[in-house]
Amino acid sequence: MSKIIGIDLGTTNSCVAVLEGGEPKVIANAEGARTTPSVVAFKNGERQVGEVAKRQSITNPNTIMSVKRHMGTDYKVEVEGKNYTPQEISAIILQHLKSYAEGYLGEEVTKAVITVPAYFNDAERQATKDAGKIAGLEVERIINEPTAAALAYGLDKTDEDQTILVYDLGGGTFDVSVLELGDGVFEVRSTAGDNRLGGDDFDQVIIDHLVAEFKKENGIDLSKDKMALQRLKDAAEKAKKDLSGVSSTQISLPFITAGDAGPLHLELTLTRAKFEELSADLVERTMTPVRQSLKDAGLSASEIDKVILVGGSTRIPAVQEAIKKETGKEPHKGVNPDEVVALGAAIQGGVITGDVKDVVLLDVTPLSLGIETMGGVFTKLIERNTTIPTSKSQVFSTAADNQTAVDIHVLQGERPMAADNKTLGRFQLTDIPPAPRGVPQIEVSFDIDKNGIVNVRAKDMGTGKEQNITIKSSSGLSDDEIEKMVKEAEENAEADAKKKEEIEVRNEADQLVFTTEKTLKDLEGKIDEEQVKKANDAKDALKAAIEKGELEDIKAKKDELQTIVQELTTKLYEEAAKQAQAQQEGGAEGAQKADDNVVDAEYEEVNDDQEKK
């Protein structure tokens, strides 16, 4: 069975891992980094992904960041005259991760386990699965990030019974899960979170502070200047990271904008104490889901054996201090918070292929599921934190006499009224025989698969007629749309590969021109004019082809010149060999002459003991 890669598709950074020899291993990207920024940029039709896209984000308005925050919504971003959905942008990132995983493994990769925040609803999970499909990946399983982290942490501890709390503060989402580990079973007891809270928000409080301080000093609002704002964002992110290790950091942004008197610079010292003051509300916000998760699991903080921190933002000292205070436990720092989720996803891939034995993963649904009933009430069929896969049925009836159709309004959430919860979908069961209200028996069944994706069925018990849907959100893509996007993604991948080949061929051609010039210089006076002319003509022809940019022409001219250069190089080696031989012969002759000049001398051995007497 081919390898299944594990992908942590993050808001700010993504990571890919694979199981090798029973051990999960992070695959480094082309730049040698173990995580890749989740950033996509478009420039004159060319796509850039990762660090290269992030670096030019200040000057390129067609740069898309933190798209994960929009998954499962109808958000679209217009770039160079084309609208892109969050699924398509995520697919570009996934394609990039897939390509360098293939480069590392030396084989095609078609299957993946992708992680999502535990608190992602059905629409967000479905959108992630669609992104994988567009990228040419068969998504074998969608698993929750905290669960993946627990897998990576607990794989070598399966013989111990432990209750662990996973605190996962990523770039744009926040989750807490309580899990029980024992006998190879990873059972999620509860999960809670906030999909609109993450490291980006910690950056934002620093940005707001810088904007306010600069306005106070210079009377100019930098938040209205797009380019200045991007520089502020980069500086804020760096300052946040610095303050995890030092107590104060200098923020210096020369020529941030211009005033009446000329250019203005931003110079400011930010202390850790000030940063903690600015972000205190955010840290406190993370404590609510921690308490909720413990309550749902029916546990007190003292019953938690270990606290695991996941996500780069957990390096913030105030965050570590808050979780320590809340749970009374020193957070475990034995796992890399940036990589642990991808490692766990790779382990789950190994469970699917059978490479990892005796490990069972029992996940839960993060939100309650149900339907709207009379009076706009939300009637729950499946309570949150129910272990998945699961199914549940309940019988309902009509609300009016002679009602021949019922609307099934499927919802996800925790609020008592339907209007306050998230609509997953609607469908209709028709042709119900007319009868007084309350007589028809309508069975509504909910099924949640192992990926947390919902199927709903409604059946008229009297006629046996049924209607069912796999929930697609309002932003959900149809199969045709996905198919179209898959084709576009493949075409783009081909175009990207062609562009890469073009660059490589041009580089090789440029190198060959340089080699030719150097070889001709080294052979000056040692080869006849005709050979020199032949080489120069071929070199000029290749230069002209490079100027024109016709790939096939460059290849042909490069091959011609290559043959000539090989002949010249052979000649160069022959010349060098002749010279070396001549030197050797000259050296041997000189040694012989030196021998002829040697004079034999008589000598007498002196005995030290005799000398001393």
Swiss-Prot record:
Residues 597-613 have a biased composition (Acidic residues). Induction: By stress conditions e.g. heat shock. Pfam families: HSP70. Transmembrane segments: none annotated. The keyword Nucleotidyltransferase does not apply. The modification Phosphothreonine is found at residue 173. Keywords: ATP-binding, Chaperone, Nucleotide-binding, Phosphoprotein, Stress response. One of its GO terms (molecular function) is ATP binding. CDD domains: ASKHA_NBD_HSP70_DnaK-like (cd10234). HAMAP family: DnaK (MF_00332). Belongs to the heat shock protein 70 family. Acts as a chaperone. This is Chaperone protein DnaK. It comes from Bacillus pumilus (strain SAFR-032). The lineage of its organism: Bacteria, Bacillati, Bacillota, Bacilli, Bacillales. The gene is dnaK.
